[in-house]
Amino acid sequence: MISKTKAIVISSVKYGDSDLIVKCFTPNGLRSYLLRRIYSSKNKQISIAYFQALNLLEISGSDKKNGQLNTIKEVNIDVVYHSIHGNIYKQSTAIFMAEVLSSVIWEESDSQSLFDFLHTAFQWFDEHQNTANFHLVFLLKLTQYLGFYPEVKNSDLKYFNLQDGIFTNVYEKESCIEGNILNVFKALIGINFDSLEELKLSSGSRQIILEVLMKYFQIHLTGFRKPKSLEIFKELFH
């Protein structure tokens, strides 16, 4: 049965000599697609360019769940990006965010609200210029949909415990952040993408808070892996 769905490209991997396996997040959860002979010189139908990281697509194809490979009959760009794939900083950010999503979105994920958040966030990212801190706000907002957004009450307390997700006056060396990094963490909580220009961070603070957020994800998500692109990404924003 052929169905039509909106989709966000999460990953694409070459399979064999000429095939491609693409993983996409849809309003009905994660879907995997096998595109046969897409690398073949005889392929005249579907371009590999459709399947760049975080592209927003509209796909007509089969709709099998549980990790089974689907086929694509037709694919179109749902929203055209104007800057993400032509700007090395944005492109690197997109690859990094796609790697994060690949680790946190499971086969059984079925969330229209998460899909809507991602769809809107990536359009905003494409349309705006001052996006050096976008990935930080994105990661923290993403925790709302993954079930471990920080408890915001008592934010006047001296520490934030990453393990418990709360502000506290009880210091635990392995779990707590404090001082300037705590202030940056507080600034990220509740901020809108439209207010990003007000967030002024040094490259050093940006890298430290990114490591804090990666640790926060590792604590709360079993099997979460730091993206392979993280070190290259950090170098670009040094």
Where on the chain are the PLM-derived regions?
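Non-catalytic alpha-helical scaffolds and adjoining flexible linkers that form interface surfaces
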Residues: 1-238
